[in-house]
Structures are given as C-alpha cells and as structure tokens.
C-alpha cells in the first residue's frame, strides 16, 4: 500500500499534467517533460522499494528450501523465461507440463507424478536427478550451453572451434597439484578476437553445476560460483597462459540460470560484439542472450526430470549390416 505522502505526490502530479491536457497545451516546454520523467522515475522507485520491503518481510516466513529456490530465481536473468512472451518462432515456449515443472523448480516444490526410483537405483528426487549421469542429461545440459555460446561467437569472432586440443606439456613447470598436464587435454571452446585483436586467442571451459546438490545447497551461491571458477582456473589457466600463449575464461553457470562473475563479464562482452553485427541496442541484445541461456538450461532441467534413462548407452543389437543385407537379399 502507498503511504499518505506517496498518495499526495501522485495526486499532485496527476492534477498538474491533467491541467495541460484539459487546456490542450501542445507548447509545453522542457520543464514539463523533465517533471514528467521525474514523476515517472519517483513512482517507479517507490514501487520497487515497496516490493523490496514485501520480499524482506515474507522471505523469512518461507521454508529453508523455498528460501534458497527463491533466492536462486532472483539471480540476474534466471527468471527471464517467465517474463518473456512465449513465441514459438523464437523458441521461447514450454508445453503445459514443462511450464508447471518450471514453476515447481522455481519455488522448490516437487513436480507432480514423479517416479519413486531413478533408473540408477537411487531415490528419485529433484536434487538427485539434476546430477545423475545415467541417461547423459548433465552432459546434454553442458553441451547445450557450449554449442549455443560457440554459435554466437561464430557470428562475431574468427577461428571458432569446439573441443580444441591443447598443446602438450613438454617440460614446462606448471605450479599447483591440480594443474591439468595430461596429453590430449581439451577445453570446450576457443575463439580469436574476444578480448583483443583478431589473432588473440581465448579458451573457454563451461561448467553447469547443480545448486541443489548436497555439496552446494547449504553454501551461499556466490561462494559456490567462486569455488567452481577457481577449480577451472587451477586446472587450466597457467597451461593456457604459458603454453598456448592465450587467455582463459571459465564459464560457470548454475542449472537454474545464474551466472558466475567471469561468465557474466564474458556474456556482456559477447552482447556488445553482437550489437554492432545485428544493429540492435545493447540492453535488448543482452536481455535476449540471457533469455536464450535460461531457456536452454530450463529445458535441460525438465528433460532431466521427465526424460527416460533406461536406454541411453545401450548398444544396438544386430549383426554386421553388410552381412544382414547379403543374407536377407535386401534391395532398395
């Protein structure tokens, strides 16, 4: 509810502008325009303050699980799937069950009609299935972000590739016990021209973590982001700097749509590069980019919950195809 001062302020502004409308005054000066913008800004700030106060009042009344889910949904871009128009031509739609599942995930509720057991034998909970490797869903989630990012980089950068193989370590001294010195090591994406000139190469490695996992759910999300960024840096950064003579950027995202600090910086940079290519405003391009990332993650979450885990990885049982064709006399 508005307090008395806010009500009086709004009423005075309405009366002020109504007088100009009644008089059909089309020659108002810059002063009126400035007052109009100021009034709009003031009312908007009052609404934001009121909403913030309501959130601060209601949040402590929620369960711990729901508090965490709500805080995750408040991260920048994590709720863009809910505020964008559901246009199928742009890929921003969910069918009705997926929409209900998305709302359940948003508020920490258990989606309806879930099985009691996972195909791996564990209890079927949201926390478990978002991390369960059976069926390959964590890899699908990771690859979706990798491929989307690589496709967008291809719009504005050169020499873009996925899963680039790193140069071998041949006697170089890499500090840190966790540094990856394995031959044939690969990262997710490499591109030229991201942070510098067209010959400056940058390597990226994507990590999408489950914020509801037992190892994460009792830790502040920002701390979890930093932890995963540091793991990636300790494994690859010095090798990239010293041997590849390039730069390294870890792209850490939560499965619920949030971004770590360096991922946020990178996607802002990518949006600014796409602006000049697509001739769009920076704010709308960044909003679109966040929405694409969020929808990709959201669909992968729903697939992990509703998808089948029973057949993935099972070999196709058949004889050699040439023998089958020969013995059965198959002809087109």
What is the meaning of each model-derived region?
Residues 24, 152, 156, 160, ...:
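Generic recognition of well-structured, leucine-rich alpha-helical segments
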Residues 208-257, 264-290:
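E2/UBC-UEV (E2-variant) core
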Residues 126, 136-143, 198, 223-230, ...:
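Intrinsic disorder
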Residues 115-145:
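Short Cys/His-based metal-binding microdomains
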Residues 93-125, 148, 152-216, 225-231, ...:
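Active-site metal-binding core of divalent-cation-utilizing nuclease and nuclease-like domains
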Residues 253-332:
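Domain-level recognition of nuclease-like catalytic cores that cleave nucleotide substrates
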Residues 1-109:
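Acidic catalytic cores of enzymes that act on phosphate-bearing nucleotides/polynucleotides
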